[in-house]
Amino acid sequence: MMTHEELELLDVVDADDRVIGAMERGDIHRKKLFHRSVHVFLFDSAGRLYLQRRSLAKAEHPGRWDSSASGHVDSGESYEAAAARELEEEIGLEATLEPVFKIRACEDSGMEHSMLFRVQGRGNDRSPQPNPQEVIEGRFFRIEEIEERLSREPEAFSPSFRLLFRRYMDEVRGAED
C-alpha cells in the first residue's frame, strides 16, 4: 500500500525546470524523473546553522543530518511557498526567506531542482520546535563543526545537504575575497 507521502502530487519538470506534467511522488521517485525541492538554512545571530536529523521513518536518507528544513514543492506551488510551509511543518517557525541559489537536478540532489533559502540574523534565535514525525533531533552547529564532521563522516549527512552546503560555503568564501 502506498503511503500518504508517496501519493502527494508533484510537478514533473524538464532539465531546465519547466513544468511538463504532474505525477504522484512515489511514481516520480521510482521513474527517477526531474522534480522540485526546497531547502532552508536557518542561522542564529551567532552565525550557527541549525541542522535537523531526519526521522528514521523517512523513505529517503533516514537518520541523516539535513538542512534546517527541506521538502518537495507540491504541484502548482512556488519554491518560496514550499520553503515557508516546510519551515513551519518541520521546525515550527515562520520567517522571512531569502533566496540564495538553485541547483540543477542531478543524482546527488535526488533528481530534484533544489532552491536554497536562508533565514539569518536578529530575531532568529527563537528555538525551533522539531516535529517528531519529521525530525529525530535538531540543533545549531558552528560552521567549523559541520565542515569537520563532513570531512570525517560524510555519510552522516544527506547527499543533497552535502551538495548545497559545499556550494553555499564556496559562494560565501568567494564573496569574502
Language model segments and positions:
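Short, surface-exposed beta-strand-loop junctions and turns on beta-sheet-rich folds
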Residues: 27, 57-59, 155-156
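Acidic, metal-coordinating catalytic segment for phosphate/diphosphate chemistry
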Residues: 3-39, 45
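A short, polar/proline- and glycine-enriched secondary-structure boundary/capping micro-motif
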Residues: 31-33, 60-64, 139-140
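Unchanged
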Residues: 71-157
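A glycine-rich, hydrophobic loop/mini-helix early in the fold
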Residues: 37-69
